[in-house]
Amino acid sequence: VEAAGLTVDDFKDTTWSDFIEKAKKVVEKNNVPMLTSSGGSEIVIEMLQSAGASPMVDGKVDLVGNEALKKSIETYKQLIDEKIMVDYTDWDQYIASMNKGTAAGVIQGCWIMSSIQAAEEQSGNWAIVDMPKLDGIEGATNYANCGGASWAVSSNCKNTDLAFDFLKSTFGESVELYDDLLPNAGAIASYLPAAESEVYNEASDFYGGQTVYKDIVDFAGKVPGIDYGAYYSDIRSALTDAITNVVQNGADIDSEIKNAQDTVEFNINE
């Protein structure tokens, strides 16, 4: 970034069109892509969520006519076509692109941090900012998530009230627990009050003194909610096929979105 005459701040609170123009300078000066990616539809789904555009509305698939989805696929195609982003199918190559400096950045959930930090020699070279937002889409933001976890109480539980109370009083409200989990297990909470704790406010040497954990929790509180119903895997698989056809075969975006919707609806009705 610095080699291109830019700073980390130039990539904060930006739009995809602005990001792409700046990224071109980074690519030109460093001869590496600005972004590394893996999983095809993953970053498209992140873009979609950043605009709060649910792929399911009132229990029905809502891909056709979803302007945020179309804009996301168009943006993805531009990133690939202009060599601003490389998308790996091999996970090891994806991680290596970060560790070996053959990509300037990545848009991913905070769980990727442990893989980035495995390259200790890169300490001080990384920073964390919010993602670009989609241009011209109502409700677009600079925030999304990827991955996460769910807590559940089994129907076989003999004391569900106690189990629910345990989850509520620990993961649901204990800042002290999260303060212990962060340094000892590397688990980052999206529980908003955790951002006010001393542990979450500690600066990270690896990220140039940035209070990354506080920033991540702050970002998490701004992520729009979207609905996948029970069909996240079906939606993601269908979108991966659509994106592949658009990027590799020059297929029409609207037609591929229609095919994706038909595929998901077929799987739901099976």
Per-region residue spans from a language model:
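Helix-loop-helix "hinge/cap" segment bordering the ligand-binding cleft or interdomain interface
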Residues: 1-42, 54-90, 155-161, 165, ...
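Solvent-exposed, amphipathic alpha-helical segments
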Residues: 3, 234, 238-249
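Bilobed periplasmic-binding protein-like "clamshell/Venus-flytrap" ligand-binding domains
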Residues: 27-39, 173-184, 266-270
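Extracytoplasmic/periplasmic substrate-binding proteins
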Residues: 43-46, 70-165
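Hydrophobic aliphatic residues
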Residues: 48-51, 94, 170
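Generic structural signal for well-ordered, non-membrane alpha-helices
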Residues: 74, 78, 237-241, 262
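C-terminal lobe and pocket-closing loops
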Residues: 112-123, 134-238
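Histidine-centered catalytic/metal-binding microenvironments
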Residues: 255-256, 263, 267
